[in-house]
Every structure is written in C-alpha cells, then in structure tokens.
Amino acid sequence: MSLLATRQRPPRTAPTVAPRPGLWRRIRAAKWSYAYLAPMAVLLLAFVVYPIFASFGYTFYRWNGIGEPGDYVGLANFQQILHDRIFWGAVGHTFVYAFVLVPVQLVLALALALVLNNPKLKFALFFRTVYFIPVVTSAAVVGVVIQLMLANFGDSAGSLLAKTGVTDGQIDWLGDPHTALAVIILIGIWHTLGYNLVYFLAGLQTIPAELYEAAKLDGCGPVQSFFRITIPMLRQVGVVIVVLAFIGSFQVFDLVQVLTGGGPYFATEVVNTYIYHLAFGGSPGSAAQPDVGLASAASFLYGLLLIVFSALQVLALRGIGRRRTAA
C-alpha cells in the first residue's frame, strides 16, 4: 500500500462563524451615525410623534385649546363627527377633487413629459422650468392672484360664454355652488402639474434608448412603442406617482381656504378646511367656538379613511401589474 493511500486525511470541520455582536456593541460601532441622526430624531419625536399621541388624547375631551382639557366626553366626539352631514359632505368634496384632478393631471403630465423628453426639442430646459414654476409658488399667492384675475376678467369670460349660448348669464365663478369646486379643481391641476411632470421625466430618462431603436427596426410605430415599451417600463414609477398624487390631493387645504374658505354654502368644504374650522372656529354650521376635541376626532377618522384607501389602492395597482406581467 502506497504512502499516499495510508496517509490519513484530516477531519473536515465546519467553518467557524463569528458570533453576532450585541446591540450595545453595534451602537458603539456606529456611534457617529447615530449622533448625526439624533437631532432629526428629536425633532421627529417633538413635532410628529408627540402631537399624534396628544391629538388622540384630545379626542376624548371637549376643549377650546385654552388651559388644560377637563371636560371628558369619551367617544361623543367621534359620534358627533360620524353624524355630521357637513363632515361627510367635506369627505365627498375631497374625493371628488382627488378623483377628478389626479387622472386628468397624470395624463397631461405624461403627455408633456413625452414631448419634453424629446432630445430634438429646442429650449426643453426652458419649458421644463416654466411648467415647474407654479409648483414653487405658494398656494396662498396663487389663490390671491386667481381671485384678482376672476374679479377683473371673470365677467368678460362669463359674457363671452353667455353670448355663445353656453350659459344663461353672468357667472360668479367662486360664488356659485355649481362652479366653485370645478374652478378649484382646474387651478389645482395647473398648480401641481409640475410635480408629476418631473416624476414622469425622471422615469422616461431611465428607459434605454436601444429599446426604441430595436422596436423601430422591427417596424413598430410611435403608438406601438408607447404601449409596448414606455408604459411597461414606467409601471413601477407609475405606481409611486399615482400614490403620491392621491396623497397630495387628499391634503388640499390652502388653495380652498384662500379662494373660498369652504363656501359658498359648504360647496367647496374639504376635510382639511373642515378640521381647521373646528379647531379655530369661525365657520357657520361647523363650530362657532374652537373645539380641539372635535377637530382631533375628525382628523383621526379621516386618517383611517386614507389608510384604508391607500392600502386598497396599492393592492389594486399591484394586482393590475401582476396580471399584465402574466399576460
């Protein structure tokens, strides 16, 4: 028997795994990272986390915001909000605003993004800046300017529509319950269009140009390339854009508050202006005196509605994406 055959092989041993360091050791290893995060964490706790818990506590009291809350009412605030027709009207107006604004705005933003993404377009940067200027303009300033424009030119537009037979006479654009919400929606579409335009531009610029070149060689036209390449490649970013667009539209407040204050006759009252009027008073039919407890209850109920809607929205968009992928 040869020497190689008789030589004993060393026993195989499992590779040693270093023990996982403890929590304190991991914190010490990243101490500077936590030190840099500490100021933001303190601000988050002070201005986000604490107000949420404090506001939830106020829902059980009748309180005008002065002194300490002392009139404990249990769930009466929630019951009053649930039976308030103005609250449900405000919810309806908010959803109408969102479900009209978001689809129209997304279609316009995608169309403009396709045009501005064309490398042959001259002055593309200038046009991008022009479309984004309304976004960086305060909604309060926009509201005041729109009021001045309607005061100076609204009668002329109403006269023109009356002469063409579209309307029967002059229109008080923000004072008529039938037109006020539509005017606010149109202004909202224009004011926040730049956000979604930038998002779509960013998504379009991630699509490789080789895909369009290959599709062109295969005989695909612009319409086929749009539905076969652009839409599928924008699916992931499109979900994010849709969710963010709905979240932003559900938070509408300043534009409505400046233009109409929720009027006329609560025709444009949205949930955020409703909560504002409850918390600070001054809205006929809502609360003559401030009631922080009612405002907190309304905000929590509205928050629950938005959580449920957002979850259903994400699930629906994911289901649509999976069906398209399977097809």
Regions found by a protein language model. Give the residues of each.
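Short, Lys/Arg-rich, polar N-terminal cytosolic tail immediately upstream
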Residues: 1-27
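A structural signal for multi-pass alpha-helical bundles of membrane permease subunits
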Residues: 29-327
